[in-house]
UniProtKB/Swiss-Prot annotation:
Name this protein carries in UniProt: NADH-quinone oxidoreductase subunit E
GO MF term list: 2 iron, 2 sulfur cluster binding; metal ion binding; NADH dehydrogenase activity; quinone binding
Function noted in UniProt: NDH-1 shuttles electrons from NADH, via FMN and iron-sulfur (Fe-S) centers, to quinones in the respiratory chain. Couples the redox reaction to proton translocation (for every two electrons transferred, four hydrogen ions are translocated across the cytoplasmic membrane), and thus conserves the redox energy in a proton gradient.
Binding positions ([2Fe-2S] cluster): 93, 98, 134, 138
Lineage summary: Bacteria, Pseudomonadati, Pseudomonadota, Alphaproteobacteria, Rickettsiales
PROSITE patterns: COMPLEX1_24K
InterPro entries: NuoE-like, NuoE_dom, NuoE_N, Thioredoxin-like_sf
UniProt keyword annotations, A-Z: 2Fe-2S, Iron, Iron-sulfur, Metal-binding, NAD, Quinone, Translocase
Catalytic activity: a quinone + NADH + 5 H(+)(in) = a quinol + NAD(+) + 4 H(+)(out)
Cofactor binding comment, as recorded: Binds 1 [2Fe-2S] cluster.
Keyword Ion transport found: no
UniProt similarity note: Belongs to the complex I 24 kDa subunit family.
Length: 177
């Protein structure tokens, strides 16, 4: 975990510190540890989509809880990333309903188009690909989450088109500066 990145310290910027304090105030003083999920999410967003050990420690200290408890939360939920990820995190649900509707083929399309496998990031740091557990949208399987957006009722052609849209977005941004 995070062994490649050393000498990294985390602190909320002023805006996020104010937001964190507002979040904590929503809980009674004796229950402020309940703010762990939103604060870890806030830290992850500030840090480019992943949680360094120092970010987990910072949040634990802010909530006056043992680091290990905060670490347990960060490692339990798949929404937290403990290593750097690409700008776009493509998460393919591969649990039974999505698998029955072709999520394995969706995963293969992603691997082919991006030339990466599960838990890998493209060399340009634009995309990370992950297989994940249920996204809770089984009625519209198969489902893919890219950052905060859900894409439902996918098939191979739709997934290829979706990846092309993200790839073309990068090409146009690079050309337009």
């Amino acid at each position: 975990m995070n062994t490649k990145i050393t000498n990294f310290t985390f602190a909320f910027d002023k805006k996020n510190l104010n937001l964190a304090e507002t979040i904590i105030k929503k809980y009674p003083p004796e229950g402020k540890r309940s703010a762990i999920l939103p604060l870890l999410d806030l830290a992850q967003r500030q840090n480019g989509g992943w949680l360094h050990v120092s970010a987990i420690e910072y949040v634990a200290n802010m909530l006056e809880m043992p680091y290990m408890r905060a670490y347990e939360v960060a490692t339990f939920y798949t929404m937290f990333n403990l290593n750097p990820i690409g700008k776009y995190h493509i998460q393919v649900c591969t649990t039974t309903p999505c698998w029955l509707r072709g999520s394995d083929n969706i995963m293969k399309i992603c691997e082919k188009k991006l030339a990466i496998k599960h838990k890998e990031t493209t060399k340009d740091q634009k995309f990370t690909l992950s297989e994940i557990e249920c996204l809770g949208a089984c009625v519209n399987a198969p489902v893919v989450q890219i950052n905060d957006d859900y894409y439902e009722d996918l098939n191979e052609a739709k997934m290829e088109k979706l990846i092309e849209q993200y790839l073309n977005e990068f090409k146009s941004k690079m050309q337009n500066g």
